[in-house]
Amino acid sequence: MVRQSIGLIALQLLNLVSVAQAATDAKRDLSEKPKMPYDPNTAADCTWWIDNDGSKNCEDIPEYWDIEMVDWLMWNPSLTLDCGNFLKGRSYCVEAKSVLPTQTSSSTATTTSQKPTATVSPLPQQDGLTKDCTKYYNVQSGDTCQKIVDQYMTFSLAEFNKWNPAVGPDCRSLFVGYYVCVGVPGTPTKPIGPSPTQPGIPKSCNKYYKADRGETCQGIADKHRLKLNDFYKWNPSVTNDCVGLWQGYYYCVGITPAFELKAFYHADCTGKLHGQTTIASGSDGACFDTNCQVASIDTFIVGDCPNGQVQISYWEQPGCTGKWFGYGYSSRGTCRKLWTEGWKFKAVHLRCASEKDDCVSKRTCTYDPEPSRGICM
């Protein structure tokens, strides 16, 4: 009996020591002042900090310190909604005066999920950020728009600019410390295409080739019947002297066009074929001379125009010059009869665009009046 009592006491003492050690370890992780660098946008009234030594996951912190996920994200705006950007060697806030965590019993603590919801939108943000954003990124020093696109490889530069219009088309207004949108409903969650690849390959790439020892850019272009300039354009990291071509890496040798179409003499996409043109993905479109020989266009169903919408801009003279007669619209997989069946214009500019976004719809521009008679006589 005495031996059993002594053993029981020893076991209890061991448990107490373990609990005390765990409490001591927790205290070592917690401090009133940050010991590591921290984001300047962290809650200014933070009262307790943790130093990220890489031993814990971001998602586990709220439960470990008995705080709400929304508070954890609010106090540490450098973290993304999916708990990304939790950097080793940085300090993070786990209590602030602005919103103090409440102590709840274990029976009530499990009634809500610790995962952030789509309604939590981290700050600061720039004006105009898309309202349906589901994934955010905190801009770091040295970032560029293209660098962010290359980092995720799940969206194009055009999509990034659409979601974050305030950064500007030249990316001059990309501000360090601000959140930008890097995902909306439907955005892929994994990089597109094989691996490894170099940065800069367009999202519209639909055909890849693995470079072998001794190959050259010209040789790869010839093998796939490409123009060398197109190969360089689709694979900017190799540079125009091909010194960046690496053995074992995949390179883009084909892209999905924005759209492709055929132009016909009759208004129902029949009769003599005047020509066929392909508009490159990510471009601002191209001018197509009709020269009074085109009354309709048949747009292929394959392409990556948003919502399939194709803008047709009518011009008086070849080369898209002279008077401008406004816009018309078509969509992929559709035969479209052209304005005046081709008799009052000689060129069209074709590109991906939404009707609601054009200057006529917004009443910020005016087009020239329709000629009283055809100009093709």
Curated annotation (Swiss-Prot):
InterPro entries: LysM1-like, LysM_dom, LysM_dom_sf
Induction pattern: Expressed constitutively with no significant difference during colonization of banana roots.
Entry's Gene Ontology molecular function annotations: chitin binding
Superkingdom of the source species: Eukaryota
Record's compositionally biased regions (Low complexity): 104-119
One Pfam family of this chain: LysM
Record-annotated membrane-spanning stretches: none
SMART domains named in the record: LysM (SM00257)
Keywords: Chitin-binding, Repeat, Signal, Virulence
CDD domains found in the cross-reference section: LysM (cd00118)
The LysM domain, residue ranges: 135-182, 207-253
Cleavable signal peptide: 1-22
Chain residue ranges for the region called Disordered: 104-124
Family: Belongs to the secreted LysM effector family.
Domain characteristics, as noted in the entry: The LysM (lysin motif) domains are small globular domains involved in binding chitin in eukaryotes. Lys2 contains one LysM domain.
Function: Might have a role in sequestration of chitin oligosaccharides (breakdown products of fungal cell walls that are released during invasion and act as triggers of host immunity) to dampen host defense.
Extra facts: In plants, chitin acts as a microbe-associated molecular pattern (MAMP) that is recognized by lysin motif (LysM)-containing plant cell surface-localized pattern recognition receptors (PRRs) that activate a plethora of downstream immune responses.
Protein name (database record): Secreted LysM effector Lys2
Gene symbol of the encoding locus: Lys2
